[in-house]
Amino acid sequence: MRKIFGHRGLPQTYVENTITSLNKALKICDFIETDVRITRDEQLVLYHDSTIENKKIEELTLSEITMFTDIDLSEMHFVSRDQIKGNANFELKINTEEDDLNKIFIKKITNLTNPDDIISSFDWETILNNREIFKCKYGILIDKENQLFESKAISNLDPKLMFMVEKEIFYSRNFELPKERCVVWTVNDSDEIMNILNMNVYGVVTDIGDKL
């Protein structure tokens, strides 16, 4: 079945990446896509931007983050898989070279996933090096055409690897990835969404899940 992914929930109606936005999207979408980061005190937060008030998320504690945002802590602090009421694509935002913190990040998110979830990242190395650890699907993000050749080679070696592909790259004449393992992002025209789904991709990420 082809899937609709709510991009950070329903961002045109609710604050993106909040638990409320994600769960509202899951009432009408097959999946949600959300960004995950780790704090200095080893807590997971659902947040897209790498910084708050010019301070890296990874350099702030959870309590410090609450001082710089109006978002309620309960809406962004990810501690239990029960908080999200459906399938999720967790995009890992890796923004530190601290190996110990990254290892904790992987361990924590792995323990918070269901088998049908997806763990993905722009950091290919993190995904590829932890494939044996993940308890769910896993994928790499592609937003540059020059990544297509390498990702195609990897796809031949790993039949489980998924590909989260930026829309314009999906349309490239050099695109040869297995479509049934591709999730295309971010598509906000309803006709275009249906056209891409009809190409037998795994899914499409959209901001307009509530308008389809």
Report the location of each language-model feature.
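Phosphate-group recognition and catalysis centered on beta-loop-alpha active-site segments
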Residues: 1-212
